[in-house]
């Protein structure tokens, strides 16, 4: 099985290092090959300061891309264009401030298998209380007893069957 991980980053070298450290701790079977593509979304190439260190300390292959248009949307599109002709089984999106549990991949693949799912998102734990907790929108009883609907799922912790990306032709998104 081949997995490609996309991490857009914008001037957060320290949290990116922690993210890569946590990915290095993921428990994997020998049959699983992982590569990481980091998309630098800063205009000043701030990532250059830690590039060599990240490569040296990672047990997985790391590739770096640059996207000058600001925003995770543009960075993820740059990634999708880069992997368009690849033969990955799954792709994953993390944010540069994600810290991944060592059992993340095992649990995500188990969920895909048990639920016959093509896309799995995981939980988010916010360490900063100022961050809006969108998960509250999914609660059935939210004080006034309204049910809120959102048209998206969190994209900072998602595993996607790559066949789906090709099937719906996500590569043609203009950025």
What are these model-predicted stretches?
Residues 12-26:
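Short, well-formed alpha-helical segments that are part of the catalytic scaffolds
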């Amino acid at each position: 099985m081949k997995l490609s991980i996309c991490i857009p980053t914008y001037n957060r070298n320290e949290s990116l290092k922690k993210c890569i450290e946590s990915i290095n701790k993921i428990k994997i079977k020998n049959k699983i090959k992982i590569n990481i593509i980091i998309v630098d979304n800063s205009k000043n190439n701030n990532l250059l300061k830690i590039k060599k260190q990240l490569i040296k300390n990672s047990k997985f292959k790391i590739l770096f891309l640059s996207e000058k248009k600001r925003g995770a949307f543009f960075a993820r599109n740059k990634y999708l264009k880069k992997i368009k002709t690849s033969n990955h089984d799954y792709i994953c999106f993390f944010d540069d401030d994600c810290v991944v549990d060592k059992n993340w991949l095992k649990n995500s693949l188990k969920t895909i298998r048990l639920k016959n799912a093509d896309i799995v998102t995981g939980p988010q734990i916010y360490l900063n209380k100022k961050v809006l907790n969108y998960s509250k929108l999914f609660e059935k009883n939210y004080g006034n007893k309204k049910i809120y609907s959102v048209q998206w799922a969190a994209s900072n912790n998602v595993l996607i069957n790559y066949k789906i990306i090709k099937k719906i032709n996500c590569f043609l998104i203009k950025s």
